Amino acid sequence: MSTTDTPLNASRLPGKIGIARKAKAYLALTKPRVIELLLVSTLPTMIYAERGFPSFGLILATLVGGAFAAGSAGAFNCYIDRDIDKLMHRTENRPLVTGEVTPREALVFSWLLGAAAIAILWFGANPLSAWLGLGAIVFYVVIYTMILKRRTAQNIVWGGAAGCFPVLIAWAAVTDTVEWPAIVLFMVIFLWTPPHYWPLSMRYGEDYRNANVPMLGAIAGAKVVSVQVVLYAWAMVACSLLLIPAGGAGWVYTVTAVVAGAWFLYESHALYNRAQGGDVSNKGAMKVFHGSISYLTLLFIALAVDPFVGSAIMG
């Protein structure tokens, strides 16, 4: 892996670029679409932990600190993976590949964003949430990006745990501790990550093979991947229901978890049936990918609404 400050694709290096374009390039380093998905789980978890709305200042600090932590991790990832990003069509326009940002600039930006995240969480929420934010960055950068991603097809399973930290950060920001409901939500996202990401890796399998990254969807056939998607989907839905006895969930969350879970299981089994019949397509795989986002969004919207409607089903 190159560690020089020379852009990987010098032929694409633009001349002097304007402030707006430079700012847009820095924003792209943070992977904003990933941040959006992570923040979907943050505010609902805070509301559920508080059983109402926390203070505006706490919400703002947690959302901004969490976004900065995720952005720092994403920028570090772009810096480390700049050698393989140029080999994949999906990532060939990232700023370090195009030369809009130099490796040195990206590295400094990553450190500054991470430091800001920890400071905001520490002083705006509490030290526990800051430590969890640091843990999320380290886990994603070191465990996933540097150790697992290029070595094992199970990379996204264990490395994906970094994406589960926002619920722990959110819960800790409100309660200054981590309790069973937060752990259940952590596990829901942990089990959600493979059936979310593996269909995407099926769609971009050629990219990952070109970069020699052993994503399961790239190195295993659709039959194998579809089995794993179904198994993780069932485990995820079952885990989501643990919030009823372990977290005092009410009817809004419960009904949503059952209905949305049943729908996602249907889509997962549809992918499985097509794959086993040799009729899987990129469109079918992406349907499950997009469906997983809808499922998680619905689940956490229900989590946010639940404290305001009725009472706990158990306890």
UniProtKB/Swiss-Prot annotation:
It is a multi-pass membrane protein. Pathway: Porphyrin-containing compound metabolism; heme O biosynthesis; heme O from protoheme: step 1/1. GO terms for molecular function: protoheme IX farnesyltransferase activity. It catalyses: heme b + (2E,6E)-farnesyl diphosphate + H2O = Fe(II)-heme o + diphosphate. Gene3D superfamilies: UbiA prenyltransferase. The chain crosses the membrane at residues 56-76, 105-125, 128-148, 155-175, 180-200, 213-235, 251-271, 293-313. It is found in: Cell membrane. It is an enzyme of class 2 (transferase). Keywords: Cell membrane, Heme biosynthesis, Membrane, Transferase, Transmembrane, Transmembrane helix. Its EC number is 2.5.1.141. One of its GO terms (biological process) is heme O biosynthetic process. InterPro entries: Protohaem_IX_farnesylTrfase, UbiA_prenyltransferase, UbiA_prenylTrfase_CS, UbiA_sf. Coiled coil: none annotated. CDD domains: PT_UbiA_Cox10 (cd13957). Its main location: membrane. One of its GO terms (cellular component) is plasma membrane. Carbon 2 of the heme B porphyrin ring is defined according to the Fischer nomenclature. HAMAP family: CyoE_CtaB (MF_00154). Converts heme B (protoheme IX) to heme O by substitution of the vinyl group on carbon 2 of heme B porphyrin ring with a hydroxyethyl farnesyl side group. Belongs to the UbiA prenyltransferase family. Protoheme IX farnesyltransferase subfamily. NCBIfam families: cyoE_ctaB (TIGR01473), PRK04375.1-2 (NF003349). This is Protoheme IX farnesyltransferase.
